A protein has these predicted regions:
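Membrane-interface helix-boundary motifs at transmembrane edges
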Residues: 2-10, 33-36, 57-60, 86-90, ...
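Functional transmembrane core segments of multi-pass inner-membrane proteins
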Residues: 65-116, 136
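Hydrophobic core segments of alpha-helical transmembrane domains in multi-pass membrane proteins
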Residues: 39-50, 94-101, 162-170
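Extended hydrophobic alpha-helices typical of membrane-associated regions
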Residues: 163-211
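Glycine/small-residue-rich hydrophobic helix-like segments
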Residues: 125-174
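Helix-coil boundary and interhelical linker segments in multi-pass alpha-helical membrane proteins
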Residues: 27-41, 76-97, 148-161, 205-211
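Intramembrane alpha-helical segments
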Residues: 9-83, 176-179
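Solvent-exposed interhelical
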Residues: 1-22, 100-143
């Protein structure tokens, strides 16, 4: 097995990586003390989870993708809710679940790409279920997210512009999932996979301008 291209890049650019880690860590610590206590506690718990992953948690099958989806969805939605003292209602829970499923789904293609590297180290969904079934799992989660968005719209918890932006995002995510395979170049995953988060914001802005 060859060395993972992302690992090779990190090794070659380790000084830059270390500098960015120190800078972002220092800045994060600076703003950490401006948050409320409950927000700080959640951040600490997420930090402990991320810290334990490479030492003990990674031995648990499928835990990597769960940790990624949990940390991403929590930091981009739940922390904002807690910090602004927004009451966590059914609507907020549904939104968090939909975001968790979305992140979970778009992370599966990265595990497909890493199949040859993860074989000896970690049990992932594509390794256990195969590529096609993994894509079906991702599709199922994305369709659940669409269902949640439609449900929220029907209960007046979501405006039309938000609904259309989310549906477009989820369908593009579906295309990304089904076009993914282990032979795709690294740039495909870096551009489309990582870029979906930016697309979510762009779709929302465009949808609000139109509707």
């Amino acid at each position: 097995e060859g060395e993972h291209p992302r690992r090779s890049w990190l090794v070659k650019n380790r000084r830059l990586v270390h500098f960015l880690m120190l800078f972002s860590g220092g800045f994060s610590l600076y703003i950490f003390f401006d948050f409320s206590v409950i927000t700080q506690l959640v951040i600490i718990l997420l930090g402990i989870l991320c810290f334990l992953y490479p030492f003990t948690l990674r031995r648990i099958p499928f835990i990597k993708i769960v940790v990624i989806a949990l940390v991403w969805s929590t930091t981009t939605m739940l922390l904002f809710t807690l910090e602004n003292n927004i009451i966590i209602s059914v609507n907020e829970i549904l939104h968090l679940v939909a975001r968790f499923f979305f992140v979970f789904a778009i992370t599966i293609p990265f595990d497909i790409k890493d199949l040859e590297y993860d074989t000896k180290n970690i049990i992932t969904i594509p390794l256990f279920f195969g590529i096609r079934r993994s894509k079906l799992i991702a599709s199922f989660l994305l369709f659940i997210s669409i269902f949640i968005a439609v449900f929220q719209y029907n209960t007046s918890s979501l405006i039309l512009a938000h609904l259309l932006a989310l549906i477009l995002l989820y369908f593009i995510a579906l295309v990304f999932v089904w076009k993914s395979d282990e032979k795709k170049k690294e740039m495909y995953f870096a551009f489309w996979g990582e870029g979906l988060s930016i697309c979510a914001y762009l779709f929302l802005v465009i949808s609000l301008l139109i509707f």
